[in-house]
Amino acid sequence: MWMRRNQIVRKLTLGVVTTVLGMSLSFSALSATPVETHGQLSIENGRLVDEQGKRVQLRGISSHGLQWFGDYVNKDSMKWLRDDWGINVFRVAMYTAADGYISNPSLANKVKEAVAAAQSLGVYIIIDWHILSDNDPNIYKAQAKTFFAEMAGLYGSSPNVIYEIANEPNGGVTWNGQIRPYALEVTDTIRSKDPDNLIIVGTGTWSQDIHDAADNQLPDPNTMYALHFYAGTHGQFLRDRIDYAQSRGAAIFVSEWGTSDASGNGGPFLPESQTWIDFLNNRGVSWVNWSLTDKSEASAALAPGASKSGGWTEQNLSTSGKFVREQIRAGANLGGGDTPTTPTEPTNPGNGTTGDVVLQYRNVDNNPSDDAIRMAVNIKNTGSTPIKLSDLQVRYYFHDDGKPGANLFVDWANVGPNNIVTSTGTPAASTDKANRYVLVTFSSGAGSLQPGAETGEVQVRIHAGDWSNVNETNDYSYGANVTSYANWDKITVHDKGTLVWGVEP
């Protein structure tokens, strides 16, 4: 976590299990686990890709310190997180100081238990060397090299393992002065036994100074740089640093973030957290939330006394936990299709549709009166034959409120932003909620959509021609409360000019 915190071990009482949350994202109906789907991860042009070269975003949760809340780290809880929350990555936080590994090296056995569970469940796992009060990673560099030599020797051939070698350097420790030299040595230790699994390196000022790392990157091609934030404390300046680092070709991983302030206890700050999550999803940045614990603090995911083995009801989740679960589930079928969200039927199922296309929509922006419409769509082929994406036209209907022109941007596309073309048009019959539409089409480079496949997220941002604020509540295609993907018939899809999905205004 970002700052030192009082660590209070709470006596756990097992709550009575009542109605289980929602419908689990059951893996019994899936053909593959996340690791089976994506395999060996690597870095390509500063972005995380899978073994097919396809960009992937990891989303998950971190344990709290194993010395205090290690009982929550087990196969049953991790299976529940995979199946119900939709995680594709779990972070096991092994503190070094504060009664951690340095004084209690047996904690490494809990790390091994977590890795074995992740291997069995087919999810990625981050082995976190959690420096914090020991602000300079060089203090325990010798122990770090011994530990990671063992881990790399054990798991060098396991594609789901990720090494995080310095959680949060702080206290005046800088990238060039202390962190980079340390990382060079520990990376060499790992690479002597594991040539290619990802390595995450913390940055200065509690893993905020990614700009320094971006300006002097490590030579290892599969290294990522950690940024940590707490939504109640950290804002736009850190998002700007992510943009800067990515512009320099540095691969960024938000390996820890919280809905609270930096103390871990103020909040939760959910609007600020949503702004962050939208941003990270826009940029394709992987993220892990802090933390899986029932500790009495705002950033804890569980309510006091929650079961240590999963099966959590809504009453077992904290406010933060409910929010984080929703965010992970909302993105669970994006960036690689790890687990599908529970489908919902369109408003008028079948009305106006003639083909085998389903369009899902989510509202990316919770402010309907700011300066942009931010929407995301995902298209599925539910038929038995391939669909050529360049034959499809997606229409998002809105009312321009008398403002001419439009400025259009593709913020993210799983098929590649360069394969998305946007323009505006006018419907045959204007209404008080639709006198224009944004047309989203695919270039030939997007390829075809095979039966049962989906495009993944395509995210489009629409500004008025004069950059003034908009009024989305007056737009036909707008869904104010559709913050998770749902089948949405107020956005239409045409295939070679024929309406195959949705209801025109």
UniProtKB/Swiss-Prot annotation:
Record's protein name: Endoglucanase 5
Temperature-related behavior of activity: Optimum temperature is about 42 degrees Celsius.
EC number from the UniProt entry: 3.2.1.4
Q: Which keywords does UniProt give here?
A: Carbohydrate metabolism, Cellulose degradation, Glycosidase, Hydrolase, Polysaccharide degradation, Secreted, Signal
**What Pfam family does this protein match (any one)?**
Cellulase
Q: Membrane-spanning regions, if any?
A: none
Q: Which residues are the signal sequence here?
A: 1-31
Q: Which gene encodes it?
A: celV
Please list the residues that make up the active site: E168, E256
What does the entry list under GO cellular component? extracellular region
**Residues annotated to bind substrate:** H64, W68, F69, Y95, H130, Y230, A262, S263, W290, K295, S296, E297
Which GO terms are recorded in the biological process aspect for this UniProt protein?
cellulose catabolic process
